[in-house]
Regions:
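Start-of-domain marker
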Residues: 18-77
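Bacterial Sec-dependent N-terminal signal peptides
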Residues: 1-24
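Mid-length scaffold segments of soluble, non-membrane domains
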Residues: 78-142
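Short beta-strand segments
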Residues: 105-109, 145, 157, 186-188
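Extended, aromatic/histidine-rich regions of cofactor-dependent oxidoreductases associated
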Residues: 165-200
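Terminal leader/tail segments of proteins
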Residues: 63-65, 79-84, 152, 200
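A mature extracytoplasmic/lumenal domain signature
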Residues: 71, 111-113, 133-135, 161-165, ...
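Acidic, glycine-rich flexible loop segments
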Residues: 128-165
Length: 200
């Protein structure tokens, strides 16, 4: 087993740092994701699920879930071992707190750096955002979802919940995935991003 914290970055073709946010057409975005899942050499799906795989189920794109968040950095925070779904921890550091609004409601999430990629070319601006919301266990995976973020501005950061994705252990329990901290629960329904996967 191995820790899978950033592998989905490559899934979404953002292995290299983007100079600006690229608002892909949702159809193109879904094709990119689904093509990755269909590729047996990299797919997180089990063979029996891959055999019958037609595509992931997504919420329809909704611009209400594309938000700019104010970021309060925590440079004094120390590295720690984040619990995962296995006994292999993820080595991370709290990068800061994000403050934003969705439909006039105020929310806060903690965002992290993955220290295993510290100094690795292409990941200089990468941040890891795990979150929970009221759709978990129903329309979406019970363990929550992740979003890949890129920080270029000291004051704000773009969060596109339409790009929320499942941990790889949602498809195969042999993967080791960071467990979403309870403090990153959003007391609302985030009807954006990928939905739950129904295994064969």
């Amino acid at each position: 087993m191995r820790i899978v914290l950033l592998s989905i970055i490559c899934l979404f073709f953002t292995c290299r740092v983007e100079k600006r946010y690229e608002n892909l057409n949702l159809t193109d975005y879904q094709k990119q994701v689904n093509n990755y899942f269909k590729d047996a050499s990299v797919s997180p799906l089990k063979p029996r699920d891959l055999k019958n795989f037609k595509g992931l189920d997504f919420f329809e794109f909704d611009s209400l879930y594309v938000v700019y968040a104010k970021i309060q950095e925590t440079p004094e925070s120390l590295p720690f071992k984040m619990k995962t779904t296995t006994d292999i921890p993820a080595h991370v550091r709290k990068y800061g707190d994000l403050f934003f609004q969705i439909i006039d409601k105020e929310f806060e999430l903690t965002v992290y750096e993955n220290l295993e990629y510290d100094g690795v070319e292409g990941y200089e601006n990468y941040l890891f955002l795990p979150f929970l919301d009221q759709t978990n266990g129903n329309e979406t995976y019970g363990g929550g979802r992740y979003i890949d973020l890129y920080q270029y501005d000291n004051d704000s950061i773009l969060i596109d919940f339409n790009r929320a994705y499942n941990p790889q252990c949602a498809y195969d329990e042999n993967f080791s995935c960071p467990i979403v901290p309870r403090k990153n629960f959003l007391n609302t329904r985030i009807e954006a991003g990928v939905k739950n996967f129904i295994k064969n």
